[in-house]
Structures are given as structure tokens and as C-alpha cells.
Swiss-Prot record:
Gene Ontology MF term list: ATP binding; serine-tRNA ligase activity
Residues noted as binding ATP in the record, renumbered to the chain: 291-293, 378-381
Main location (coarse class): cytoplasm
Uppermost EC category: ligase
Disulfide bonds: none
Gene that specifies this protein: serS
Claim: Ribonucleoprotein is one of the keywords in the record: no
The protein's name: Serine--tRNA ligase
Organism: Nitrosospira multiformis (strain ATCC 25196 / NCIMB 11849 / C 71)
The reaction(s) this protein catalyses: tRNA(Ser) + L-serine + ATP = L-seryl-tRNA(Ser) + AMP + diphosphate + H(+); tRNA(Sec) + L-serine + ATP = L-seryl-tRNA(Sec) + AMP + diphosphate + H(+)
NCBIfam families on file: serS
CDD domains linked: SerRS_core (cd00770)
Skewed-composition ranges (Polar residues): 239-248
Function description: Catalyzes the attachment of serine to tRNA(Ser). Is also able to aminoacylate tRNA(Sec) with serine, to form the misacylated tRNA L-seryl-tRNA(Sec), which will be further converted into selenocysteinyl-tRNA(Sec).
Length: 456
């Protein structure tokens, strides 16, 4: 969330920066509400002063034995006016808060300006894409030929955008996550963390998913305990409806499946004042992630690239504001290190103003080479959110003067496990249908060097 003081003092500058993000700031609405807020605050202060003055007159009149009924009536009238003014002030402040919660972060000055992903800027490349003396297959064909990847059964069980991995492919998927965690903990200094997979609305507001992106989430409403669960009644019919909630349409008692472990990891410092000696805080977690992909209809419908359920090893850093951009380079390098150890070619892209995520001030995307597509595809997104999330979470530390100051938060994938598996299948495929296992993973696979087709 942006600093309301910044909007009040540099509104035109903020609106211009937001326009670079393709966000149209509701200037007229905000200005009208802000003007009304100022007037109401002045009115409430004046009414309070008048009521206090009249209350003193009552005491003076009674001490002199005079009739105070007129003054009592005036105090009652002023009290009614004050209640009305305070009620309207609460409404106006809630409306301003609603606007604030919809506004994305401001881009850092180093972010390239652009209108679409085509304006993203390449920063560097690593590795050379492999060449094949045969036509490379995509991961779906490879997995099915191995007899270890079954999309039809996954669709039967759950529907579209789910995967079923078996045997050595499921083992390789698990090995990848274990390998990533080991590297980040042992070499990069992160603390492994086990987090809840269900979080409340306040946690999602803290990291910026709510209220703006509710449609991208899987919500798990809680059934009222007083209501019996009827065997033949639709589940939705037994659940309470809270669509009129003032906080963006969600009931704070309801839970949501995490879209990324960034949410629970970052919220560890919500409503806390952190000892500065503990900074930086570096956390990692391996979790499933759940996304509705509401805005992705028709995109990447084949295979594992875009799933409702996938696994990811997440990296989160909580840092002193003066160090956050150094931390962004470090965190991005930690994600890159995984690809380098796996010998997977990739490139790093600096996202332009229009392509960054809602909470980010600056983002690097890491894209891995997929031979069958002949292109690089995102496998990690590493962002510095500056104080944007910390302000929503009230995550602070004490500065040198002993005053609470907002922390800076960073997050990145280190990496998306499923997409890394896809990249291995495609980059290490062989003409006989087998897939070579990267050397750094063979120890996690009991010494297995190749995945071999089931009919070989």
C-alpha cells in the first residue's frame, strides 16, 4: 500500500508513475473524498470544542443555581451532530482505504518504462541452448512416452490444469524440491520454514492479493458449526455468504489456499517490530501453490506450464530499507544458482513498468530455455516490494533513533518445481526417448542416471 501522505502531497507525480503501470488513478474520486475528509475532520474538531465548552457552562450554571436546561439541550444537539460527522468521516476514510488497497506499487526509477511484456529488457544470459540431431519433443510427449505422466487421469480426478506423476518422475519432482531447499539453506543462508497452506484474508491483504485479486484465489469458506451438514445438500448451500464484507467481499473467518508461500512467509513479521540486529531475515519454504488462473483462459492449456496446483520453493527476505536493492540482486542470484547447477540455459529479464506484479517496485524474471517451443519461459520472478507490503502488514523495525520504521520485503521463486521438471525433460531428452538426469540430482535419485521409457 502506498503512503497516504505521498498521495496528499505529490498526487500528480504519483498519478504519472501509476500511468506508466497502465493504472488509471481515480483522481477526481480521491480528490473529492480527500476534500470531504479535511472538512469533516475540521467539523468534528469544532463540534468537540463547542460541546466541551457547553459542558463547562452546565457546571458553572448549576454551581450558581441557574437553570441549565437550554445548555443541556445544546450539548445534546451538538452530540448528535458530532455522531453524524464522525459516522460520515468513518465512511469517507473507509472509501479512501478502499482506493489505497487497489493501487499498485510505484516503479523504481531503474525499471524500464513500457506498455507490455514486449518492452521487458534482457539483462543477461547463461548457458547455451542444446542442439539435437532429432526433432525435440515437448514434456507432455516425453512424459507420456516414459509412462510416468498422466493428464487424462488427472483430469478425471480433478479437471483441467492438473497433473498426475508416477514412479521415477514423481521421485525426480521430489528430488528437485529437496535439492533446491538444500542449496538455499546450506549455501545461501535461508532458514527452512514449514508454513500453513491455508491463510486468512488479513494475510492475503498484507501481501497484496486481496482485495484486488480475489478471483485468482481458491477460497475455503467455513461452515457455521450450528448448521447441520446434510448429506444430499450441495456444499455451497451449507456455507455462509459474506459477499457484503467491507474489506473487499471476503469474510475474515474464511480461509484461502495459498497462491504462493510468499504469503505465509511474509506475514510472519506482520504486526511486529523486528529487532534490527535480526536483519536480514531470510526464509525459504517448499509448498504446493493453488491458483484459479482466472485470467489465463486458453493459455498454456497443454502440459504442466500453467496449473491450478503446483509446487514451488519460495525465497523471502525481510531487510533494512537501505539494503533492499542489494538484496534483490542477491536473491535473484540465488535462484539463478539452481539453474546453473542443473546446467539449464536461462536468461534474466528486467520487467517493464506495465508488466510488473501488483506489489513490486522492481522485478527480474528468470526464463529457462524450452527446446520444443524454441523460446525462454518464466521459471522464477524475483521482486523488491520495498515498503508496500510492510505498510499493509505493519511490519517494522526500530531505526537508529529508536523509532519504528517500515521494513522492506522481497520474494522470489527458487524455483517453480514443475517448470524446472519440464525444463529437465525437454533439455535432457535423448533420441531413444530416455531423459538424462542432471548429475547434481543423481544422488537424490539413488544413483539413477536416466529415466527410461516403460517399454524399453
Amino acid at each position: 500500500m502506498l503512503d497516504i501522505h505521498l498521495l496528499r502531497t505529490q498526487l500528480d507525480h504519483v498519478a504519472r508513475l501509476l500511468a506508466e503501470r497502465n493504472y488509471v488513478f481515480p483522481l477526481a474520486e480521491f480528490s473529492a473524498l480527500e476534500a470531504e475528509r479535511k472538512n469533516l475532520q475540521t467539523s468534528t474538531q469544532e463540534l468537540q470544542a463547542r460541546r466541551n465548552g457547553a459542558s463547562k457552562q452546565i457546571g458553572n450554571a448549576k454551581s450558581r443555581g441557574e437553570d441549565a436546561s437550554a445548555i443541556l439541550a445544546e450539548v445534546a444537539h451538538l452530540g448528535d451532530e458530532l455522531k453524524q460527522a464522525e459516522s460520515r468521516l468513518d465512511q469517507v476514510q473507509a472509501a479512501l482505504q478502499h482506493i489505497l488497497l487497489q493501487i499498485p506499487n510505484l516503479p523504481h526509477s531503474s525499471v524500464p518504462e513500457g506498455r507490455s511484456e514486449s518492452d521487458n529488457r534482457e539483462v543477461r544470459r547463461w548457458g547455451t541452448p542444446p542442439t539435437f540431431d532429432f526433432s525435440p519433443a515437448d514434456h507432455v510427449s516425453i512424459g507420456e512416452r516414459l509412462g510416468l505422466l498422466d493428464f487424462p487421469t488427472a483430469a478425471k480426478i480433478s479437471g483441467a490444469r492438473f497433473s498426475l506423476l508416477t514412479g521415477s518422475l514423481a521421485h525426480l519432482h521430489r528430488a528437485l524440491a529437496q535439492f533446491m531447499l538444500d542449496v538455499h539453506v546450506r549455501e545461501h543462508g535461508y532458514t527452512e520454514t514449514y508454513v500453513p497452506y491455508l491463510v486468512n484474508a488479513e494475510s492475503l491483504r498484507g501481501t497484496g492479493q486481496l482485495p484486488k485479486f480475489k478471483e485468482d484465489l481458491f477460497e475455503v469458506p467455513r461452515r457455521k458449526t450450528a448448521e447441520p451438514f446434510l448429506e444430499n445438500q450441495p456444499v455451497a448451500a451449507t456455507l455462509p455468504s459474506n459477499s457484503n464484507s467491507p474489506q473487499g467481499g471476503q469474510d475474515d473467518d474464511d480461509l484461502y489456499l495459498i497462491p504462493t508461500s510468499e504469503v505465509p512467509l511474509s506475514n510472519i513479521v506482520r504486526d511486529r517490530i523486528v529487532d534490527p540486529e535480526l536483519l536480514p531475515i531470510k526464509l525459504t519454504a517448499h509448498t504446493p501453490c493453488f491458483r484459479s488462473e482466472a485470467g489465463s483462459y486458453g493459455r498454456d492449456t497443454r502440459g504442466m506450464i500453467r496449473q491450478h496446483q503446483f509446487e514451488k520453493v519460495e525465497l523471502v527476505q525481510i531487510v533494512h530499507p537501505a539494503h533492499s536493492y542489494k538484496a534483490l540482486e542477491e536473491l535473484t542470484g540465488h535462484a539463478e544458482a539452481i539453474l546453473q547447477k542443473l546446467k539449464l540455459p536461462y536468461r534474466v529479464m528486467a520487467l517493464c513498468t506495465a508488466d510488473m506484479g501488483f506489489a513490486a517496485a522492481k522485478t527480474y524474471d528468470i526464463e529457462v530455455w524450452l527446446p520444443q517451443q524454441g523460446t525462454y519461459r518464466e521459471i522464477s520472478s524475483c521482486s523488491n516490494c520495498e515498503a508496500f507490503q510492510a505498510r499493509r502488514m505493519q511490519a517494522r523495525f526500530r531505526n537508529e533513533k529508536g523509532k519504528p520504521e517500515l521494513l522492506h520485503t522481497l520474494n522470489g521463486s527458487g524455483l517453480a518445481v514443475g517448470r524446472t521438471l519440464v525444463a529437465i525433460l525437454e533439455n535432457f531428452q535423448n533420441a531413444d526417448g530416455s531423459v538424462s538426469i542432471p548429475k547434481v540430482l543423481q544422488g537424490y535419485m539413488g544413483g539413477t542416471e536416466r529415466l527410461v521409457p516403460h517399454n524399453a
